[in-house]
Amino acid sequence: MKIPFEEISRIVIEGNYASIFLISGKRYVLKTSLKRLQMKLNQELFIQSHRSTIVNLKLIGRIDLNRNKVIMKCGAELELGNKFRNSVKAAYH
């Protein structure tokens, strides 16, 4: 399956499966790892925001550092891991 990078909003890993959420609202589930996906993604467009989440930088609405959340333009609120706070904040601004 080929999905254009710019159509991916976020990727959430649950166990051995990755849920790929598209801007259109569609969701695809693949059996793969976070590391495998990171190798295929455009590193300038995507950043890891949590141990199980990768987000599209262009689709971040805002970052709430008080609540450790990444709020996507679509309204989805995702956890922001302490380990990833600084890198997400720097890449977003």
Question: Model segments located where?
Answer:
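Basic, polyanion-interacting recognition surfaces, primarily
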Residues: M1-H93
